[in-house]
């Protein structure tokens, strides 16, 4: 499999996005209804409120999947390998628009064929430092012909891999990957999982 411990690629300039202290996330009740907003910086702690996010898996023109290694400065799960990118929609922002915006900011990618594949994915996970993620997190796939230009504050490293190779690596060493990727790999057919995407999916990880 592609070496997932390779030397980090040089980061390139990326579009400016508001600092997390100014970024608002959408708060949700247990039924998934929007109940308000809060600064992103205030909702990721030891008692994280349920909020709306998204994950995206990006394929290139050869069918390879982009995996990224989270920057060491990230609050939660620094330095672990994960799916192509994640993010949070702004209040009233359509999710596909948020996916494209985040791809441009974090990786310098222009996306096409943005499609939901796990629209009801939900999880709660706690990292080694006690930081909790608690999200309803629709999962998307997309395609790109762009060359990644990773933002250094977001991405330490990246690699293009065959989906089957990633599936094998996640199952062999789940501790090396983000918990949401480990859970998604159990559900996504291209990673060897299986799920009816119309069914609400939930998982708790500590």
UniProtKB/Swiss-Prot annotation:
It comes from Agromyces mediolanus. It comes from the Bacteria. Pathway: Isoprenoid biosynthesis; dimethylallyl diphosphate biosynthesis; dimethylallyl diphosphate from isopentenyl diphosphate: step 1/1. Its EC number is 5.3.3.2. Mg(2+) binds at residues 86, 106. This is Isopentenyl-diphosphate Delta-isomerase. GO terms for biological process: dimethylallyl diphosphate biosynthetic process; isoprenoid biosynthetic process. Binds 1 Mg(2+) ion per subunit. The magnesium ion binds only when substrate is bound. Binds 1 Mn(2+) ion per subunit. It is an enzyme of class 5 (isomerase). PANTHER family: ISOPENTENYL-DIPHOSPHATE DELTA-ISOMERASE. One of its GO terms (molecular function) is isopentenyl-diphosphate delta-isomerase activity. Mn(2+) binds at residues 44, 51, 88, 133, 135. The active site is at residues 86, 135. GO terms for cellular component: cytoplasm. PROSITE patterns: NUDIX.
